[in-house]
Curated annotation (Swiss-Prot):
This is Polymerase basic protein 2. Pfam families: Flu_PB2_1st (PF20947), Flu_PB2_2nd (PF20948), Flu_PB2_3rd (PF20949), Flu_PB2_4th (PF20950), Flu_PB2_5th (PF00604), Flu_PB2_6th (PF20951), Flu_PB2_7th (PF20952). It comes from Influenza A virus (strain A/Ann Arbor/6/1960 H2N2). GO terms for biological process: 7-methylguanosine mRNA capping; cap snatching; DNA-templated transcription; symbiont-mediated suppression of host cytoplasmic pattern recognition receptor signaling pathway via inhibition of MAVS activity; symbiont-mediated suppression of host gene expression; symbiont-mediated suppression of host mRNA transcription via inhibition of RNA polymerase II activity; viral RNA genome replication. Keywords: Cap snatching, Eukaryotic host gene expression shutoff by virus, Eukaryotic host transcription shutoff by virus, Host gene expression shutoff by virus, Host mitochondrion, Host nucleus, Host-virus interaction, Inhibition of host innate immune response by virus, Inhibition of host MAVS by virus, Inhibition of host RLR pathway by virus, Inhibition of host RNA polymerase II by virus, mRNA capping, mRNA processing, Viral immunoevasion, Viral transcription, Virion. The lineage of its organism: Viruses, Riboviria, Orthornavirae, Negarnaviricota, Polyploviricotina. Its main location: virion. Belongs to the influenza viruses PB2 family.
Length: 759
């Protein structure tokens, strides 16, 4: 009450009223701004004001027993006043200094482990090199970038489970650690953090930095991998840039880079196989990148490169809703269109069937080295604003936009026939035909486009058909801008479908991606990519195909051998022999195949002529569709090391060399593995291998029922007898052995006994 009376008294004096009304503080909005809510409105001022006080910091009461009242200089370190509203004491900033110098020492062993990302950053900066500063206009475009080097790629939910398990292992709550990476990380971190005294909350924060990819939408000119983004403030300003080479690489950037290379290789390879989608899936599932399964990386990695997105679509994952054309990512920002088929005539009077987009639409186009805004109507380019690093990049963007516009003058600019094919030798679709044509040479396109006078607009300039800049004239509708076009910021993902030929469509049926969009750029992966699929054997050239094919036969010899005798056609059709065919001269493939198949048939017919080494050596040649001919060969040619080399049908050669004493096979001097059995003895009858574990009793005995196939033998109980069909229709009586110990001798005796039983 007293206070209120006092205030009323003050207000009655005209001077008080004048001060309060003439100064801006009486603005209710301002008073509200600085007094409402818990959020500090002017942190730096508050900090300066607090630090000017004698005791701006509060501490636990126990501190008074651990710190002297005064330091060596006699300055007071803590106040006897307790903090209003809590049972803490007020201390001076000098107390912190004293504590840091004289306080108790704790073990520092866990710091580098917990603050790993910071320690690594310091190392990278220490070893990084900063080059000269250049002053120039920076074309920055906002891109979604990774701001957190050195992280694993767990989803937020997966990381949360790992953190809870590591930091609060005894807390209640359902945590299911399923993925390989979750389990590995949890185990590793639990071991690292035994007896760790750092506060659990801090540990949790730091683990989050290590486990989850953090992205921001930032203006960037130049490198976008996380080791460049962490020094963005040092390397590029509004009008300057500083050259920088990072002092180390981080696994997350390496994973991104290697994933793109693996995905491109796989999509390119799948596109030329008989069933692209099935092949692509088979390869994704059997490939490892840096020791991690590629499918696991695809599930977690947000990279939006075309080949990566095709692989994700094949796995049924959601992908970005933007589409790709000519290496640019298009995102429709307004308008809409309907599609209908239309036939058009090129300048060479060739008829093309194109899907025309009818309606007004606006797009952003973002490429590696150029960006643009495109406004178009039905088969008409209204406006194109391009920005890019150099003339070449700008030209690329203009060509793509002109083709995409489907304008008649573009189609009429075609000279000559359009017959571009993809890797599988199939004709490209009309839009990609046009694109390839003008990417090769755009002179006629630019000349025929037409030019116009331009108004002087800030930051925009015209461009002539020969790509020179101009302030007076420009190609119709085309302008070059100093400012870049931002990448589409939304990270939304949509459900898509993918067809057999790897064309990815959204739910409206618009094609978002196709193998034609996958870059042909080759690179060297940072992490080891292990392709287990036979389709990828050829990636390292003919020699690798040769070695891998023979290694595969040797590794799977037990099954191959049985198929060779019982179901050769199925064996010849195995996809593992597909890559080998590219090494055999096309003209003679069929004859070789016919010759080898006949030879094999004779081996099956004539008991005892089974020769393991020869079967292994010649088997890949039998995979081609056979041509019947009377031709005999003593050697077969394969194209490796830039020329034809010969494999001898009988005997060793530099390509195929089997050492009988060591039982080792070398292909072109490279070790291809060991054969488990000696080709001369145990395998002279293929049945010997199959009849291991059975005793041959003699000729067929009808009392034991109809003859079983070799496959059906496995169902017999120990001691049970049965007739079995072997080789070429001969039937013998066998009994399943009661003991396993004597199995080894079966192979040797089987051959002799089969002969006796048959004769």
């Amino acid at each position: 009450m007293e206070r209120i009376k006092e205030l009323r008294n003050l207000m009655s004096q005209s001077r008080t009223r004048e001060i309060l009304t003439k100064t801006t503080v009486d603005h209710m909005a301002i008073i509200k701004k600085y007094t409402s809510g818990r959020q500090e409105k002017n942190p730096s001022l508050r900090m300066k004001w607090m630090m000017a006080m004698k005791y701006p910091i509060t501490a636990d009461k126990r501190i008074t027993e651990m710190i002297p009242e005064r330091n060596e200089q006699g300055q007071t370190l803590w106040s006897k006043m307790s903090d209003a509203g809590s049972d803490r004491v007020m201390v001076s900033p000098l107390a912190v200094t004293w504590w840091n110098r004289n306080g108790p020492m704790t073990s520092t062993v866990h710091y580098p482990k917990i603050y790993k990302t910071y320690f690594e950053k310091v190392e990278r900066l220490k070893h990084g090199t900063f080059g000269p500063v250049h002053f120039r206009n920076q074309v920055k475009i906002r891109r979604r970038v990774d701001i957190n080097p050195g992280h694993a790629d767990l989803s937020a939910k997966e990381a949360q489970d790992v953190i809870m398990e590591v930091v609060f292992p005894n807390e209640v709550g359902a945590r299911i650690l399923t993925s390989e990476s979750q389990l590995t990380i949890t185990k590793e971190k639990k071991e690292e953090l035994q007896d760790c005294k750092i506060s659990p909350l801090m540990v949790a924060y730091m683990l989050e930095r290590e486990l989850v990819r953090k992205t921001r939408f930032l203006p960037v000119a130049g490198g976008t991998s996380s080791v460049y983004i962490e020094v963005l403030h040092l390397t590029q300003g509004t009008c300057w840039e500083q050259m920088y080479t990072p002092g180390g690489e981080v696994r997350n950037d390496d994973v991104d880079q290697s994933l793109i290379i693996a995905a491109r290789n796989i999509v390119r390879r799948a596109a030329v196989s008989a069933d692209p989608l099935a092949s692509l899936l088979e390869m994704c599932h059997s490939t490892q990148i840096g020791g991690t399964r590629m499918v696991d990386i695809l599930r977690q990695n947000p990279t939006e490169e075309q080949a990566v997105e095709i692989c994700k679509a094949a796995m049924g994952l959601r992908i970005s809703s933007s589409f790709s054309f000519g290496g640019f990512t298009f995102k429709r920002t307004s308008g809409s269109s309907v599609k209908r088929e239309e036939e058009v005539l090129t300048g060479n009077l060739q008829t093309l069937k194109i899907r025309v987009h009818e309606g007004y639409e606006e797009f952003t186009m973002v490429g590696k080295r150029a960006t643009a805004i495109l406004r178009k109507a039905t088969r008409r380019l209204i406006q194109l604003i391009v920005s890019g690093r150099d003339e070449q990049s700008i030209a690329e963007a203009i060509i793509v936009a002109m083709v995409f516009s489907q304008e008649d003058c573009m189609i009429k600019a075609v000279r000559g026939d359009l017959n571009f094919v993809n890797r599988a030798n199939q004709r490209l679709n009309p839009m990609h035909q046009l694109l390839r044509h003008f990417q090769k040479d755009a002179k006629v396109l630019f000349q025929n486009w037409g030019i116009e006078h331009i108004d002087n607009v800030m930051g925009m300039i015209g461009v002539l058909p020969d790509m020179t800049p101009s302030t007076e004239m420009s190609m119709r509708g085309v302008r070059v801008s100093k400012m870049g076009v931002d990448e589409y910021s939304s990270a939304e993902r949509v459900v898509v479908s993918i067809d057999r030929f790897l064309r990815v469509r959204d739910q409206r049926g618009n094609v978002l991606l196709s193998p034609e969009e996958v870059s042909e750029t080759q690179g060297t992966e940072k992490l080891t990519i292990t392709y287990s699929s036979s389709m990828m054997w050829e990636i390292n050239g003919p020699e690798s195909v040769l070695v891998n094919t023979y290694q595969w036969i040797i590794r799977n010899w037990e099954t191959v051998k049985i198929q060779w005798s019982q179901n050769p056609t199925m064996l010849y059709n195995k996809m593992e022999f597909e890559p080998f065919q590219s090494l055999v001269p096309k003209a003679i493939r069929g004859q070789y195949s016919g010759f080898v198949r006949t030879l094999f048939q004779q081996m099956r017919d004539v008991l005892g002529t089974f020769d393991t080494t020869q079967i292994i050596k010649l088997l890949p040649f039998a995979a081609a569709p056979p041509k019947q001919s009377r031709m005999q060969f003593s050697s077969l040619t394969v194209n490796v090391r830039g020329s034809g080399m010969r494999i001898l049908v009988r005997g060793n050669s530099p390509i195929f060399n089997y050492n009988k004493t060591t039982k080792r096979l070398t292909i072109l001097g490279k070790d291809a593995g060991t054969l488990t059995e000696d080709p001369d003895e145990g395998t002279s009858g293929v049945e010997s291998a199959v009849l291991r574990g059975f005793l041959i009793l003699g000729k067929e005995d009808r009392r034991y029922g109809p003859a079983l196939s070799i496959n059906e033998l496995s169902n017999l109980a120990k001691g049970e007898k049965a007739n079995v069909l072997i080789g070429q229709g001969d039937v013998v009586l066998v009994m399943k052995r009661k003991r396993n110990s004597s199995i080894l001798t079966d192979s040797q005796t089987a051959t002799k006994r089969i002969r006796m039983a048959i004769n």
